[in-house]
């Protein structure tokens, strides 16, 4: 099974991971709760697994990319019961908190496998060996070397974080924490300028820092909130989930969670107001009242 890999979860990122493996000539097993997504990949050359457990048993390297850690653990429920992961490397590539990374890794190791936790720092359409965006991976050192040929198909910028299974989640959440705070700041700054009749597009030109802040200003200035209508990016609902992860990590680590609690509530209010499918810049609509 040295040239085989399994991909569990075929959302936008999971499907991109599977296609990258297929492009590299790897025998690729796939599983997803929604069968049409499996059928699409099978038509492209993948092999369907009937269950998540079957996918985990089909290859020595297993890439897990689902929406939550709870979903990931549920997908492999039968494997946890029969301890069938001996000789396998399981790489958790969904968004997790450090505590969740440790929990998932403990289950993998108890079932006889080697555990890695990773963070992919790009959108699905950039996945591939020519991608320069970082992919950070930590955990079992021997497992990393086994998984390396498959991980290199995700990005040419593979960062080995050593044996710290929680490092990728911590770094990922650290970057995401700056992002969710900045997007809230953009909305506030835009509303401030609106109230005073100042030019938001000029503010965008003046702003040279932060993750894509100028684009969010322009979206607000042009009321172009439909997702990807002006610039690509994550939906407000996706960023609301990010805020929840950052809040959970602060509480888990016992650090002051006042700011992430506020931000999580702020983002969730925007989702509850019906803006979840719009660009994250739609946060300004909550401030507009």
Residue ranges and their predicted role:
Residues 1-64, 88-89, 124, 195:
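NAD(P)+-binding Rossmann beta1-loop-alpha1 motif at the extreme N-terminus of oxidoreductases
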Residues 16, 54, 61, 67, ...:
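Amphipathic alpha-helical hairpins
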Residues 28, 48, 115-116, 158, ...:
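Hydrophobic beta-strand scaffold residues
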Residues 52-114:
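Rossmann-fold NAD(P) dinucleotide-binding segment
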Residues 95-96, 100-177:
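Rossmann-fold dinucleotide-binding core
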Residues 167-287:
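Helical "substrate-binding/catalytic lid" subdomain
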């Amino acid at each position: 099974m040295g040239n085989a890999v399994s991909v569990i979860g075929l959302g936008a990122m999971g499907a991109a991971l599977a296609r990258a493996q297929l492009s590299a000539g790897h025998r690729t097993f796939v599983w997803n709760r929604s069968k049409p997504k499996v059928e699409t990949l099978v038509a492209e050359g993948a092999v369907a697994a009937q269950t998540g457990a079957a996918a985990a048993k089909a290859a020595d390297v297993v890439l897990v990319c689902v929406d939550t850690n709870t979903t990931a653990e549920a997908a492999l429920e039968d494997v946890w019961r029969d301890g069938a992961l001996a000789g396998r490397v399981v790489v958790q590539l969904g968004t997790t908190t450090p505590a969740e990374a440790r929990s998932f890794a403990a289950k993998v190791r108890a079932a006889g496998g080697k555990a890695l936790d990773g963070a992919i720092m790009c959108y699905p359409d950039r996945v591939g060996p020519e991608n320069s965006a970082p992919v950070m991976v930590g955990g079992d050192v021997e497992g990393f070397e086994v998984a390396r040929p498959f991980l290199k198909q995700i990005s040419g910028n593979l960062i080995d974080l050593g044996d710290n299974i929680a490092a990728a989640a911590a770094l990922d959440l650290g970057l995401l924490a700056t992002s969710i705070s900045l997007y809230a700041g953009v909305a506030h700054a835009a509303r401030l300028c609106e109230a005073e009749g100042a030019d938001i597009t000029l503010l965008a030109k003046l702003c040279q820092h932060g993750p894509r802040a100028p684009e969010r200003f322009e979206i607000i200035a042009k009321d172009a909130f439909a997702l990807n209508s002006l610039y690509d990016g994550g939906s407000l609902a996706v960023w609301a989930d990010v805020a929840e992860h950052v809040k959970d990590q602060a509480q888990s680590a016992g650090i002051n969670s006042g700011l992430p609690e506020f931000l999580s509530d702020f983002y969730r209010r925007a989702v509850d107001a019906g803006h979840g499918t719009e660009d994250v810049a739609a946060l300004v609509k909550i401030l507009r009242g």
